[in-house]
Amino acid sequence: EGKGSQFDPDIAEVMLSMIDEDEDYNMRQVEKMVSNILVVDDEKINIRLIENICKNEPLYKVIAAESGKQAIDIVGNQQIDLVLLDIEMPDMDGFQTLEEIRKITDVPVIFVTAYKDYKLIKRARQMGVEDYITKPFLPIVFLETLYGVIG
């Protein structure tokens, strides 16, 4: 009387190890769900803006490239789930960069650009671009576009 229930120490040890394993498993599942988003823009301020918008989204990890060539190198060496690609860049434009990326992978691509030209949008769609975001953009519109492509 007055004594609480006790677990058998062996059973308690097994249960604790199962909980630890389950936590490790859950952490691995969360890591698998994180989407690596490659932002390709020669303007650092645009990269910082996107990083700031995405920092409150725990399942989005932003990776930055300041040129098409750098983007191609990253795509060839890392798991990338989405590319946000500027059109107007000095070394290679967005279309040239996209052509090179397509030689490596069919990762979804969204153009993020100041251009609002219908012909450019049509060309982008023909090349397999998933969507098109014009700068400047509202953060909510930006995030909704990302959700629509990668969830």
Task: Give the positions of each predicted feature.
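Short amphipathic alpha-helix used as the core "switch/output" element in two-component signaling
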Residues: 73, 95-106
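Receiver (REC) domain active-site loop signature in two-component systems and cognate sites
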Residues: 89
